[in-house]
Design a protein with these regions (language model features):
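A short, well-structured juxtamembrane/interface segment
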Residues: 19-44, 50-56
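Short, well-ordered alpha-helical scaffold segments within catalytic/effector domains
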Residues: 32, 51, 76, 100-107
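Catalytic core of membrane glycerolipid acyltransferases/transacylases, capturing the structured
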Residues: 44-97, 157
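Conserved beta-strand termini and adjacent loop/short-helix elements that scaffold enzyme active sites
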Residues: 30-32, 71, 93-96, 178-180
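Short amphipathic alpha-helical segments and helix-helix/interface helices
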Residues: 35-36, 58, 80, 134-135
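Residues that cap or initiate secondary-structure elements
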Residues: 33-35, 53, 74, 124, ...
């Protein structure tokens, strides 16, 4: 089996498994009204989420005209195709490879009218350390950063750098939003200095 066919097969099976598993979850949203109000007013947002909580958050925000940054490594191709099957637009790149191109692509997607999403600690960590790409994109586009976290009443944890969270069947999955946060700065370099503040805000949101 060549690589293209292998990836296509993994994606097809993965999407089926995710839909089957996630359809059993009991979803609960906490503090979602500020996001809804911002969207009603036409204000765009940039979701910031830790990589380890990606799966339940991909499911929660599916089909909502969101462009998400996915890494360019081989596993990223599988994740990108799964995300696209759930209704996301994808921008390829990361902080370690293709980062500038990914940031430009994300800003173009936001300028085109989509919300954005980024894992500021992805794709390889260190876990829960907020890289500056999200704050630079928010400063350049005027999007508000929407911190978003997930937790589950019962879950598996992978033995990966991010301790990837997979809620078990019929788990109660809680998606919590932090305060929508603007990034006001005179330059991208000045915007990047806001990263520790955004890390503290994201860490303060209840999650796994």
């Amino acid at each position: 089996m060549n690589e293209t066919r292998r990836v296509r097969w993994i994606v097809r099976v993965g999407v089926w498994l995710i839909r089957a598993l996630a359809s059993t979850w009991r979803m609960e949203t906490v503090n979602g009204e500020p996001l809804a109000a911002a969207r009603r007013s036409g204000q765009q947002v940039l979701f910031a989420l830790w990589h380890g909580e990606l799966l339940p958050l991909l499911w929660h925000q599916r089909g909502e005209n969101v462009a998400i940054v996915i890494s360019e490594h081989r596993d990223g191709e599988i994740i990108a195709q799964i995300a696209e099957s759930l209704g996301y637009s994808t921008v390829r790149g990361s902080s370690s490879k293709g980062g500038s191109r990914a940031l430009i692509g994300l800003m173009r997607e936001i300028d085109a009218g989509r919300d954005g999403a980024i894992t500021p600690d992805g794709p390889r960590g260190p876990a829960r350390v907020f890289a500056p790409g999200a704050v630079v994109a928010a400063q350049r586009t005027g999007a508000l950063i929407a911190p978003i976290r997930a937790s589950a009443s019962r879950a598996w944890r992978l033995k990966s750098w991010d301790r990837f969270l997979i809620p078990k069947p019929f788990a109660r999955v809680t998606v919590s939003f932090g305060p929508l946060t603007s990034v006001v700065a005179d330059s991208p370099r000045a915007a990047a200095e806001h990263a520790p503040r955004l890390q503290a805000i994201l860490d303060a949101v209840p999650g796994s």
